């Protein structure tokens, strides 16, 4: 089970590592204005991927019952939304503690959260849990 679980984590980790390389090595977010938009959308997809497969594993293990498509959708949607909020909190704390300028405005903050949630919605709308459970 853990091997399968780690395989579900590989996509989100790859997205995060890609983000780190773009930020720390290439300073790409300052050079390519639209990169932030695409990465938040991709981050929402990655989070939804991990959450979806985690819910399926919890269902198979009889820890959580998510056989209803509505229950599955609401769980994934709610957890993706919570994850985007937590990510933005982390950015705020980084800005505050290290005097960085990651969150340039409230508009940017809301756009980032919106794009993460939309990415999650796109993933969950195309995902078929009935084929997995």
Show where each model-derived region lies.
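Residue-level signature of transmembrane alpha-helical entry/exit and packing/kink sites
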Residues: 8, 37, 68-76, 108, ...
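Internal alpha-helical transmembrane segments of multi-pass membrane proteins
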Residues: 57-81
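Small-polar-interrupted transmembrane alpha-helices in polytopic inner-membrane proteins
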Residues: 10-23, 72-94
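Interfacial helix-loop-helix junctions of multi-pass membrane proteins
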Residues: 26-36, 84-117, 121
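Hydrophobic faces of alpha-helical transmembrane segments in multi-pass integral membrane proteins
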Residues: 14, 43, 47, 51, ...
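"…centered on the first transmembrane helix and the immediately adjacent amphipathic helix/loop
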Residues: 1-53
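Membrane-interfacial alpha-helical segments at the cytosolic side of multi-pass membrane proteins
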Residues: 42-60, 96-101, 117-130
């Amino acid at each position: 089970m853990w091997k399968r679980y780690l395989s579900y984590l590989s996509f989100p980790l790859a997205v995060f590592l890609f983000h780190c390389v773009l930020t720390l090595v290439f300073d790409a977010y300052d050079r390519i204005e639209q990169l932030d938009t695409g990465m938040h959308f991709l981050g929402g997809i990655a989070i939804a991927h991990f959450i979806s497969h985690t819910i399926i594993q919890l269902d198979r293990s009889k820890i959580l019952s998510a056989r209803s498509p509505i229950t599955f959708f609401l769980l994934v949607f709610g957890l993706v939304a919570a994850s985007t909020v937590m990510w933005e909190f982390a950015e705020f704390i980084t800005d505050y503690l290290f005097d960085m300028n990651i969150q340039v405005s409230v508009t940017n903050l809301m756009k980032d959260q919106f794009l993460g949630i939309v990415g999650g919605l796109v993933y969950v709308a195309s995902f078929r849990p009935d084929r997995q459970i």
